[in-house]
Amino acid sequence: MRLPVGLARAFPEFASNEYEVSGTKAMEPGTITITINERESVTALLYPAAQGKRAGMTVVLGHGAGANQLSGFMRMIATGLAARGIDAMTFNFLYTEQGRHLPDPKARLESCYAAVINAALNHRKLKKNRLVIGGKSMGGRIASQVAAADGKGVAGLVFLGYPLHPPGKPDKLRAEHLKDIKAPMLFVQGARDAFGTEEEIRAVIKNSRLPATLYTVEGGDHSFKVAKRLGVPQDTVYETITDKVVEWTRAL
């Protein structure tokens, strides 16, 4: 899968990478410009669902704090979803779009994600689809905060490594708002995630009585990396995660 020419020029460090999913090259993503306010916009990538497999679902994914939508993980998961019949959309938050490294304040992150949700709901190729939102780490957390405030149009949420608390600070939970989300949720969490272990996520789900499903990546860290001694190829880990997300999304 090659990047659109404009993005390839803007981010040359990612331009040469290609991804294949289940032996089949996915269609190239389309580029969308989403207006956030009168002066600012962000770039989104739409990975179209494979013909003949379309599920009538869109999954919007926000990136984590230390990457952008062109990271290997984001491109791989979006391509995998599309190959399995899910329309996938990724996007840059304003700070990454503008070449900055420090995440924006909460309100600015949320307003950006809310604008992307609106764009997905009204896009001519997606507006008949049901919508799932989420993302990697921070991207998933911001999606959850937006859904907690106003979940209109959101059929479900997918969290790929939910940052329940800062590493080493299990008392500083970022979970109080989750009880305000009415839509079903899927937590994909590494068993040894320093931002929230399987046990910690399971406790939040139980104590807050969330309409949630937990899929644990055995031996996985916050990036779902597993130790070589476990004998599980990393590509297999990622493929399994993608399969779980698709299975859960199609069942909504």
Sequence positions of predicted segments:
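Acidic catalytic loop of the alpha/beta-hydrolase fold
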Residues: 192-195, 222-223
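Serine-hydrolase catalytic machinery in alpha/beta-hydrolase-like enzymes
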Residues: 32-130, 149, 224-232
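Catalytic active-site module of serine/aspartate enzymes centered on a nucleophile-bearing elbow/loop
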Residues: 229-252
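Primarily recognizes the serine-hydrolase "nucleophile elbow" in alpha/beta-hydrolase
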Residues: 113-180
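Short beta-strand/loop motif that positions the catalytic acidic residue
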Residues: 181, 187-189
